[in-house]
């Protein structure tokens, strides 16, 4: 991953981890975009442990827009996930991929962020 080519944010560049992490069901994952971040959860793991299916969180914003604080579980402690919003990823060629595209992921981290300047 190259700063300025794959990401415009130094924080996202530092967060993204292209190394292999053995995914586990229930593990949190953060996808690092150009400046934003999206929170996902592992819902299924492939038999060879080199791929998994992620489901997108549907976090609820807490406070005002610039605070960037989110609630990821409902009152009962159940994760708030978007129905039908999934992504299947595979680790190949030393990168996490979704189809032919490389995705910049941070495992064991749940972080939602929307850049307010856009």
What residues fall within each predicted segment?
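Short intrinsically disordered terminal tails
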Residues: 1, 23, 117-118
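Short, extreme N-terminal segment that most often corresponds to the first beta-strand
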Residues: 2-7, 27-28
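Intrinsically disordered, low-complexity, charged/polar segments
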Residues: 5-9, 62-118
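Short alpha-helix capping/helix-loop boundary micro-motifs
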Residues: 8-19
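Short coil-to-beta transition motif at edge beta-strands of beta-rich domains
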Residues: 17-33
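His-enriched metal-coordination microenvironments in redox/metal-binding proteins
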Residues: 32-37, 117-118
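Short beta-strand-centered aromatic/proline hotspots
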Residues: 37-46
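Basic/aromatic-rich interaction segments and small domains that mediate binding to polyanionic partners
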Residues: 45-65
């Amino acid at each position: 991953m190259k700063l300025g080519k794959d990401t415009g944010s130094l924080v996202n560049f530092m967060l993204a981890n292209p190394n292999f992490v053995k995914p586990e069901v229930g593990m949190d994952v953060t996808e690092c975009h150009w400046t934003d971040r999206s929170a996902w959860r592992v819902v299924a793991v492939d038999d060879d442990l080199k791929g998994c299916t992620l489901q997108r969180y549907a976090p609820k914003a807490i406070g005002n827009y610039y605070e960037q604080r989110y609630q990821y579980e409902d009152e009962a402690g159940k994760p708030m996930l978007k129905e039908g919003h999934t992504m299947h990823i595979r680790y190949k060629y030393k990168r996490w991929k979704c189809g032919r595209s490389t995705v910049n992921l941070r495992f064991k981290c749940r972080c939602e962020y929307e850049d307010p300047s856009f």
